[in-house]
Amino acid sequence: EECGPNEVFNTCGSACAPTCAQPKTRICTMQCRIGCQCQEGFLRNGEGACVLPENC
């Protein structure tokens, strides 16, 4: 699968990945999900792009 900038494909990524709105990793009991996730150190913004925290 093609991923966007600053993303990586993960076969078992967190279903509760950190975002600009919720930057702290939260306790997650949901199953892992297959798909593109932000690279380490990046957060998903409101438009769905992976950005550095200072660009949120």
Curated annotation (Swiss-Prot):
This is Chymotrypsin inhibitor. Disulfide bonds join 3-36, 12-32, 16-28, 20-56, 38-50. GO terms for cellular component: extracellular region. Chymotrypsin and cathepsin G inhibitor. The keyword ATP-binding does not apply. It comes from Apis mellifera. Belongs to the serine protease inhibitor-like (TIL domain-containing) family. Its main location: secreted. Residues 3-56 form the TIL domain. It comes from the Eukaryota. One of its GO terms (molecular function) is serine-type endopeptidase inhibitor activity. Keywords: Disulfide bond, Protease inhibitor, Secreted, Serine protease inhibitor. InterPro entries: Ser_inhib-like_sf (IPR036084), SerProtInhib-TIL_Domain (IPR051368), TIL_dom (IPR002919). It is found in: Secreted.
